[in-house]
Amino acid sequence: MFLPSPNNLSGLNQNILEELLRDKRSPNTRRTYAKALKDFFLTMAGEEPSPDVIAWFLSLDHFQAIAMVLRYRAELLAKDLKPATINVRLAAIKSLVNYARRVGKCQYTLEDVEGLKAETYRDTTGVSPTSFKQITDHITPDSLKGKRDLAIMRLLWDNALRRAEVCGLNVGDYQPTERQLLIKGKGKLGKQAITLSAKGMALINQWLTAIGPRPKNEPLFCTLDRATFGHRLSGNAIYNLVRTSAESAGIHKVMSPHRVRHSAITAALEATNGDTRKVQKLSRHSNLNTLMIYDDNRHQHQAQITDILADLL
């Protein structure tokens, strides 16, 4: 379906899409929404999003807009995409429309367009503490890179940090006197203090001593290659660090920072005999039901029942 040339665009003198993306706090959300909206307009309009084609879409009447988004949802279903992926793309379109309504560039809503029911956080499998120690034991602390990598791996395990939380750390966020680290959690506006382990602090101290004095607004963990020395580590860099370290240690499961987080949370539940309230302080999940999924997977209740049924025959 290709849209006709847009008309009556004199009232739109700014790029609504750029405004929307600037309004999003998370860089990851900005990238995801930009990609989703690009796919929507390429699929339904035959061209990439521009001020003109976006204005045309926003000028549709209520029923035309809903019909178009429902057709797009049908296209995504036909591609056999996961419900979570489809919901993210629909959320991006709804966010665009909602933002445009707030600034007076659109008269309709997409509240009648429902997302798909998705099962979330199902795969919470990770590795055991023994396997994770095997990974860290293969990182040599003799080099500057080794000291940095060990400190990062400790934070991923001891505090179950997300990679974006590690990337966003500044030197000034480390407060050894208080035994604290200030992190910007997922979806949070401000920073929150978390308590560090003695072993974690020791590794951070070794890294900071080796790298030398740096301003408080500089990244706590930085790049070390000649071309970009001192720059903030990217999320991809931390992902590659975890994955390659696991491979070097002979771990067959594909590891990632989030899988380390899964591993740490599962190990914490095991160590506390399933005390989800206590472990929630570590994981910082806003919804306790998410931790219940971790706990269910830890016990493998379904597997146990399946074995019981099999033995009845």
Swiss-Prot record:
Belongs to the 'phage' integrase family. It holds the Pfam family Phage_int_SAM_1. The active site is at R162, K188, H258, R261, H285, Y294 (o-(3'-phospho-dna)-tyrosine intermediate). It comes from Synechocystis sp. (strain ATCC 27184 / PCC 6803 / Kazusa). Residues 7-101 form the Core-binding (CB) domain. Keywords: Cell cycle, Cell division, Chromosome partition, Cytoplasm, DNA integration, DNA recombination, DNA-binding. This is Tyrosine recombinase slr0733. PANTHER family: PHAGE INTEGRASE-RELATED (PTHR30349), PROPHAGE INTEGRASE INTD-RELATED (PTHR30349:SF64). Residues 122-307 form the Tyr recombinase domain. GO terms for biological process: cell division; chromosome segregation; DNA recombination. CDD domains: INT_C_like_5. Transmembrane segments: none annotated.
